[in-house]
Amino acid sequence: MKTFVLLPTGEGRTTDDLQFLEFSAYVERALTARGYQKATDFASADLAIFLAYGIGDPQTDTYTYTLPVWGQTGVASSTTTGNVNVYGNTGTYSQTTTNTPQYGVKGYTSHQGSNTSFTRHAYLTAYDLVSYREKKKEIVVWETKIESAGSSGDLRLVFPVMIAASRSFLGISTGKIVVVNLREDNLPVLEVRGLPIPDGKAKKKE
């Protein structure tokens, strides 16, 4: 079983950083599920795993769409009724025409909308500490790059979902980009967050 220490990377980040402490707990649970064990200290660790994370600037895309305008488009039918009134040698005639309107799409209106999205990322890079102690060489054992895009700009909300999505692939080579779709209430996310598992959610093997 490989032991590890998890360290932050990025300007101004330390192991005492509150956000790192929160995020590292998610990563540690994911690594434990993959068979890794958190080392008691740096000297006893087999791997030093560096965690980088961040979120990009919002990107807004605009689009145009049309909506139908409903209304009267014509006359479907007409009905005419008449009356004849006779007074002696004189008669009058009157008539009434009733039109039944026809309704449908009489045109379209143009509108504009927009979508704002954020790109979120988390990078995990594992270095071989045993080799470093013996040969003073920095050897990367494995690296996992996680990226997601969506409407949420709250990295704290999205981060555990990203880690849960990558959990099955930590420490292995996928050979390609892997796309994973998860929701906040999916089992891997609940496990990474350390939340109680509701009844009815069976444990899935990774």
What are these regions (language model features)?
Residues 38-44, 84-90, 160-162, 178-185:
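Low-complexity, flexible helical/coil segments
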Residues 101-206:
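C-terminal/domain-edge helix-coil "capping" segments
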Residues 23, 55, 66-68, 157-159, ...:
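General N-terminal targeting signals
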Residues 1-34, 39-45, 56-63, 181, ...:
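A structural "domain/chain start" motif
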Residues 2, 27, 34, 45-47, ...:
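Envelope-exposed proteins and targeting segments
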